[in-house]
Amino acid sequence: LIAYKVGSMTSLDWTPHCQSVELVMNGKHVGNYLLIEQIRADSNRVPCEDGFLLECDFHYDNEIQWIQTPGKCIQMQNGIPFGIKYPDYDDGLTGLMLSEIKEYVRTVSEAVYGDNFKDSYEGYAKYLDVKSFIDYWIVFEVMINHELGNPGSVFLHKSADGKLTAGPIWDFDWGVLSYNVSPQARNGLVNRDSFWYARLFDDSDFKAAVKSRWNELLPQLKTIPAFIDEMEKTLQTSAELNFRMWDPSEDASQNGGVIVNGDERMSYNAAVARLKKIYEERLEIISKNL
């Protein structure tokens, strides 16, 4: 919920709308869930109906997928797992279209890692919508989402006559979760060396653009704690009922018995206070490290 609120403050083409809901199944109340718009190529969602939508995901859940090198991913020494979310064969994808999409991704990757990558006309800026890549990175960085380095639910899209654009954001089940176990989360930047950003940050102009955009967005980002307070009050009764139905401490240890998030055995209000504190600390940490 917080991640999508942050995303909506940026220039990303589209951020899914979401709403906390009470779910009733067969007449039985089963708790509080987040209802969210699905990602799809659509004039009202991801504007790439005449282009393509890519998903980078090491789970390899897409019908069409490949490893593109160079690129930085925790799962392998070199390469990024790409998949085509749209179009698929049911949408009319042909062998020629598939070859063209893969060739385009290869061209972009080589431009990012090429000797002339800083060149405005032949480097990464020729192919990437740089502002979207900056805003996308900022959302991941604020929410401590490591999935840029371990690609899962990382989306890119391109319209027929546009550049390769970052977004939309999605998932964030690992957002804030790693704060207790990641020194980077508590002291620095978690996605400085992830994905293509490992190369982009080698360009002083890109770094300067990130810092400038950060300072531009910071006043809006500082309003999120008030939004957290508002949602805490709105969901108070719902959360109390939800905690009785689903004890977070019982299924929180899917990671070999380790409490990875740090709030599994906290009360609702204590967990919210922790979330707000971490968020405020991240704003300070990022400001110091850019």
For each of these PLM feature ranges, what is it?
Residues 1-28:
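A conserved helix-loop-beta module that forms one wall/lid of the active-site cleft
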Residues 11-16, 28-138:
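Internal "kinase-insert"/substrate-recognition segments embedded within catalytic cores
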Residues 17-19, 30, 150, 163:
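Short loop/turn segments at connectors of secondary-structure elements within structured domains
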Residues 20-28, 35-41, 159-161, 171-175, ...:
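An acidic- and aromatic-residue-enriched active-site/binding cleft used to recognize and process polar
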Residues 21, 33-34, 51-53, 154, ...:
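A broad, low-specificity signal marking well-ordered, structured residues that form hydrophobic/aromatic
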Residues 82-150, 154-290:
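Middle-to-C-terminal accessory/interaction subdomains
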